[in-house]
Design a protein with these regions (language model features):
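Terminal amphipathic alpha-helical/low-complexity segments used for targeting or macromolecular assembly
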Residues: 1-98
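Structural signal for interior beta-strand "rungs" in well-ordered beta-sheet cores
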Residues: 94, 99-160
Length: 160
């Protein structure tokens, strides 16, 4: 049902967006965070072994359309953060089982980060990314939007 709703919303002009549409987008982003919605996923029936979910890519684009540019800085003088209101930095707690070493790392809301992932600074994980359990994102690595990374991988320093 979520795929069809996102497809319909994608066709709506931004001037028509209302609170129901924003609630749908929040539901979509939550599904991304849980790993239940993926931009691509394994598909044994596909010649490549993968299926691209275009509805997910459309949902991500919707977030950019729906968001206003706002100041989300914690310490504006030291590190300004001005971006779309729909894609803040993801909230992470110890219960998530993710290790984020201090030193300038960011994970954008709308990405799945599996348990046991280690994030070495500085690194960035963008919206729509899926990072499997036990993976290490090493220093100066950029995990792009919609990137699909398996379990127990090492994304080496400087990778993009």
């Amino acid at each position: 049902m979520l795929p069809e709703q996102i497809e319909r919303l994608f066709e709506e002009p931004p001037a028509q967006y209302n609170e129901t549409h924003f609630a749908l987008f929040r539901e979509f982003k939550s599904a991304l965070n849980r790993g239940e919605a993926r931009a691509a996923e394994p598909d044994a029936g596909s010649p490549t072994g993968w299926r691209v979910n275009t509805w997910v890519k459309k949902g991500i684009l919707l977030g950019f359309r729906m968001g206003a540019v706002i100041d989300m800085s914690v310490d504006r003088a030291r590190q300004p953060f001005i971006d779309k209101s729909t894609y803040p930095v993801r909230s992470v707690t110890p219960a998530d089982g993710i290790r984020i070493v201090p030193g300038g790392s960011s994970i954008r809301d709308g990405s799945f980060i599996g348990r046991g992932v280690v994030c070495m600074p500085p690194m960035f994980i963008n919206v729509g990314a899926y990072v499997g359990e036990g993976t290490m994102i090493d220093s100066h690595a950029l995990v792009g939007s919609c990137a699909q990374i398996g379990h127990n991988c090492h994304i080496s320093a400087g990778s993009q």
